[in-house]
Amino acid sequence: MNRIIPLWSEIAPYTQESPEQAQPSVKEFAVPGSRGAVVVCPGGGYEFKAPYEGDPIAEMLNRAGISAYVLDYRVKPCHCLAPLSDASRAIRVVRSLGYEKVGILGFSAGGNLCCSAATHYDAGNPDSPDPIERLSSRPDAFMPCYAVVSLCQYTHIGSRNSLLGAHANEMPFVRFFSAEQNVTPDTPPAFIWHTSTDEAVPVENSLLLATALAKNAVPFELHIFPI
């Protein structure tokens, strides 16, 4: 039985838009003795979470000896910071379980969430009464898979609209969730892949991210497949 771990002991922040999504969680796929873990973010355009990008991916990571935690994050009608707060909290929660390294992986819109977690993080609040909030939310690595990296150009408009809601055409919000515009030299290393013929999420998304990482001397590996 895979344990379901709530991210918060009480109602999660930013829940006013969707009380039925008040308790996001991670589903545990632990490998005994594993020193590293990956938070898995399924795609779905910020409207749903695709099942085939969740549990099967965790099981694949398990076969490689890596523990995995599938994130049940909030989607439309929750907007903007709600999904990101879930991803950041998930990294802290998984880190609290004793893993030496915690990465984050995401597909399509889940890849956008993965990239946001890798570019908007903090070291934790040492004065927080919640011990989990004292931990860093910076992933040790991130793995965007055919990700909606940018909400500015070459974007998947459905993901942009579902994530930002009424703010979908406000550039400060658009830029904040466009990872290529938020990379710094402290951004964690990345493993990026895409297909050159992707019609839903253009390959330029991954190319923009790789370019930004290169300019900031952040280690990355990029794979573009022809199909």
Predicted regions: what is each one?
Residues 1-33, 80, 157:
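N-terminal cap/lid segment of alpha/beta-hydrolase-fold proteins
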Residues 89-158, 174:
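Primarily recognizes the serine-hydrolase "nucleophile elbow" in alpha/beta-hydrolase
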Residues 186, 192-194, 198:
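Short beta-strand/loop motif that positions the catalytic acidic residue
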Residues 199-208:
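Conserved alpha/beta-hydrolase "acid-adjacent" motif
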Residues 35-43:
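Short beta-strand element of the alpha/beta-hydrolase
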